[in-house]
């Protein structure tokens, strides 16, 4: 979906532009947003986005794309590709140039727009991609639970639980659901690469002289985030902390110690503790419990660093606000207690756990912030 903007449509010499026309157009856009998302999903899975990126700015026709991707029924496939890319061009996903072909008919060619960098299925730049996250959110399993949102609101409970009779993480761990679990892990890993790269670019709290020598990553999975952080900041010693069955799968990382346990029982000691996308999984009571354990594990003047989406205090018609509120409703749909929060709400949680109410925020990327709280 795009931000509400004024569109001017013209067909057959006529034009529509009054407020009521535009309001209705916007209503249709909102209601038809799944068409854009699912078309983009297919374009990513077919390899169209990667192929346009590989063209390095050169314009490519739908016929050429169909041939390069060896799509069967080339003529029909090329016509379908052209219609898909024409839609995506209207949303600025790709660029489109139209000229008369040898037969006098309109002939379109396409090139990657800047957004395609973040939609690559096979990103090898090291920056990561948002495509795996999008493919996860648009997967059948994760789309199904949206059909239960109304019931979850009217009857109580969580839409995912109503759809599948179990919680999200229990579902992912069940026999037979390995494809969904793999898709989920790929999405989280790719998204983490994007944000951790930006965290290292903009956040100075890990620098030598910042007072951090031992960094504990709570809920750090198999240690991918600490691998990136300690590679950039070799003066740091890392402690990767997660549930024992997760740590059992963690590969050795130079300068990083893997420890298994529960953040609800105990957190290992360090001069700083990192919580990246942990608190948004939990309700307020659970968050305070986690933060209290972090407080106990820190020395005087030690810091807890929260890396989270931060909601604006009131809704705004901006891409950043829309993404944050969109994610918040995803959490409402999938996880009991899970939610996004404002900076003040994070501050209130930290204060309830004993931390200073002085929050030091650093903007990272795509409305993700690093929020530092001191003991």
Curated annotation (Swiss-Prot):
Single Gene Ontology MF annotation: protein dimerization activity
EC number assigned by the record: 2.1.1.232
Induction: By jasmonic acid (JA). Up-regulated in leaves infected by the pathogen M.oryzae.
UniProt keyword terms in alphabetical order: Methyltransferase, S-adenosyl-L-methionine, Transferase
GO BP annotations, alphabetical order: biosynthetic process; methylation
Region spans: Substrate binding: 168-188
Active site residues per record: 280 (proton acceptor)
Gene3D superfamilies: Vaccinia Virus protein VP39 (3.40.50.150), Winged helix-like DNA-binding domain superfamily/Winged helix DNA-binding domain (1.10.10.10)
Catalytic activity: (2S)-naringenin + S-adenosyl-L-methionine = (2S)-sakuranetin + S-adenosyl-L-homocysteine + H(+)
Binding of S-adenosyl-L-methionine, residues: 219, 242, 263, 276
Residues at which substrate binds: 136-142
PROSITE patterns on file: SAM_OMT_II
Family: Belongs to the class I-like SAM-binding methyltransferase superfamily. Cation-independent O-methyltransferase family. COMT subfamily.
Role: S-adenosyl-L-methionine-dependent methyltransferase involved in the biosynthesis of the sakuranetin, an inducible defense mechanism of O.sativa against pathogen attack.
Name of the protein in its database record: Naringenin 7-O-methyltransferase
């Amino acid at each position: 979906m795009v931000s509400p903007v004024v569109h001017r449509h013209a067909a057959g010499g006529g034009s529509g532009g009054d407020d009521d026309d535009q309001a209705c157009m916007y209503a249709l856009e909102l209601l038809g947003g799944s068409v854009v998302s699912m078309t983009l999903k297919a374009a990513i899975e077919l390899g169209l986005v990667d192929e346009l990126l590989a063209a390095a700015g050169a314009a490519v026709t739908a016929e050429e794309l169909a041939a390069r991707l060896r799509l069967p029924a080339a003529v029909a496939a090329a016509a379908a590709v052209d219609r898909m890319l024409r839609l995506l061009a209207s949303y600025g996903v790709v660029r489109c140039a139209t000229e008369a072909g040898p037969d006098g008919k309109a002939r379109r060619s396409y090139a990657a727009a800047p957004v395609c960098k973040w939609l690559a299925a096979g990103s090898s730049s090291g920056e990561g991609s948002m495509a795996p996250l999008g493919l996860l959110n648009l997967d059948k399993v994760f789309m199904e639970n949206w059909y239960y949102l109304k019931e979850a609101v009217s009857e109580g409970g969580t839409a995912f639980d109503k759809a599948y009779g179990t919680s999200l993480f229990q579902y992912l761990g069940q026999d037979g659901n390995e494809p969904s679990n793999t898709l989920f892990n790929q999405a989280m890993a790719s998204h983490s690469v994007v944000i951790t790269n930006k965290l290292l670019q903009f956040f100075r709290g890990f620098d030598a002289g910042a007072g951090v020598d031992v960094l504990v990553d709570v809920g750090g999975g198999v240690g991918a985030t600490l691998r990136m952080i300690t590679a950039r900041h070799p003066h740091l010693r890392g402690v990767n902390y997660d549930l024992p069955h997760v740590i059992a799968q963690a590969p050795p990382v130079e300068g990083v110690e893997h420890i298994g346990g529960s953040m609800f029982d105990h957190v290992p000691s360090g001069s700083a503790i990192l919580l990246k996308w942990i608190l948004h999984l939990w309700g307020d009571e659970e968050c305070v419990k986690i933060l209290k354990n972090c407080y106990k594990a820190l020395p005087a003047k030690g810091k807890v660093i929260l890396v989270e989406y931060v909601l604006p205090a009131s809704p705004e018609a901006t891409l950043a606000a829309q993404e944050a509120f969109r994610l918040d409703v995803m959490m409402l749909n999938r996880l009991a207690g899970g939610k996004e929060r404002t900076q003040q709400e994070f501050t209130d949680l930290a204060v309830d756990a004993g931390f200073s109410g002085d929050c030091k925020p650093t903007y990272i990327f795509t409305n993700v912030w690093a929020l530092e709280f001191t003991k």
